[in-house]
Amino acid sequence: MTTFIEHLNGVDFENRENVKIRDRYNASVPTVVGPVSRPNSVFVEDAKLLRQQTEQPIKWALPGPMTMVDTLYDNHYKSREKLAREFAKILNQEAKELEAVGIDIIQFDEPAFNVFFDEVNEWGIDCLEEAINGLKCETAVHICYGYGIKENTDWKNTLGSEWRQYEEVFPKLQQSNIDFISLECHNSRVPIELLELVRGKKVMVGAIDVASNIIETPEEVANTLRKALEYIDADKLYPCTNCGMAPLSREVARGKLFALSAGSEIVRKELSARAIA
């Protein structure tokens, strides 16, 4: 998030204000002091380098417009929607340049979609549509409950026995032009049947808990995927982690990724066996 925003004009990182982020915890954030713009590409050179290293598909993550707005103090536009739409234009520019150098999937991270439901449905998804406008590569939106920092884990403990936040935004997302929806499932209290609301979309099912150092077994991963398959067609299910693994050690992250791969292979073989039978 900060890595992208710090390359933009109109945002002052020295002039900071305390604001409530995700409507739950206070943080010192940069200030929007003028019109925002992107003077140069931010990640294109990195994307070129990565493209040279592999022939496999590459998914590149960018911050989503609403989440960018929620991570700043706006002293210029004085409107979350206006600022989000400006960010959507900037993200669209960056996304098109990433596509041009061979990125296959561009993902927009929108944890704010799990909090500001009215704004999501009024203008948040529209901003996402603006960010993907004209792209020929596949696109994704990632909505989770945050990785394993204390502010996020404390918040999760207040959400009760069922986490139904996805229910508020899935219907409109299902009708959007976004190709993939990336979700948190394993070790969460999200009712798995909510996936029915996005049937027809490609779904990245979070089968790895990024808020724990405990490495899942392949069978645990497989169980999460089996449950998801009750509501997602097999050709549209893409196993993934709940969120990013930045807070985890490399050893733990590597172990979790191996488990994700092994668990996915278990389910893949089960599906192949059924097809043959």
Show which residues each predicted segment covers.
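Domain-level signal for soluble alpha/beta catalytic cores
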Residues: 1-277
